[in-house]
Amino acid sequence: MVKLFKKISLLIVVLFISGCTKKSFLIYEGVAMTIPYKIIIGDLIDKKSGQLISKKINETFSITDRIFNNWNPNSEISFINQASENLELSISLTLFEFLEEVETVFLLTKGLFDPTILPLKDLWLSKLKEGSVPSEEEVQMYKEAVGFEKIRLNKQNLTITKSNSNTRIDLCGIAKGHTVDLLIKTLKDNRICNAYVEWGGEIKTIGKHPIGRYWQVIPIKTLNTPIEINSCAIASSGNYEQEWTVENKTYTHIIHPKTGCPLEINEKSVQATTVLHEKCLYADAMATTLMLFPSKEESQLWAECQGLTTYIKGGDS
């Protein structure tokens, strides 16, 4: 994912589909933190309710910008990234609960999903953009700051402590999905029963489309045919977003936390993954994790062991 979070920029377009009536189906479209979003309300609602929902959407994106956006130097996560080692920081309940979920995913994947890879990510991207690669010594030095086990969460005091001052958290692999979950919750809290939410390719639905069928999605990178999703989320990841060729090797933007190196594209590598789950946060994290396996077959086997519904594209499929 390319620079998922920058300064927030909101534009909401409301389309009154049945304009001759007092109640209408609504579509909200815009850009939040450089990423396009689309929200379709499948219920008939009046203008006043539509304006309230518009406000709530704005507030939800603002929460993500204020708390989870590591491109915002004043966000909570940025303050954590700037903190020195063994400094106990008080954080909001919202961020604490989110990081608990991140820790759960880290443990479930045995460290394959690790948001503390930011130091390595920055190292590799800076080198690849120059047409070079870092030395093994540089990679090993930066790896010392990587590992979510270097993060200590204190639930009683709602605090976080880093054991290494260079440890920095990159939430790009999970915060989009979490925001989509928050948007759906916001709509449900405002008595919306049927809706489609998409932000930067991460999708979640409730209820049905206005014509009465379940919502349909086309995961173009893995399936390229419509599938119905019934009140669940769908998230994708792939090596198609960024790549660099250096010394006859093609590298992607996805860093493997175990090796400390970006994934290389070859005839066996996983090219794209799509995951369906009731939580978009989880689908988002699992889609990224499944990219890390050496082949489509190994990725599928791990997904089956986790009971995941997936679509996985390999180099030969």
Where are these regions (language model features)?
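Short, linear, compositionally biased motifs with a strong N-terminal bias
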Residues: 14-15
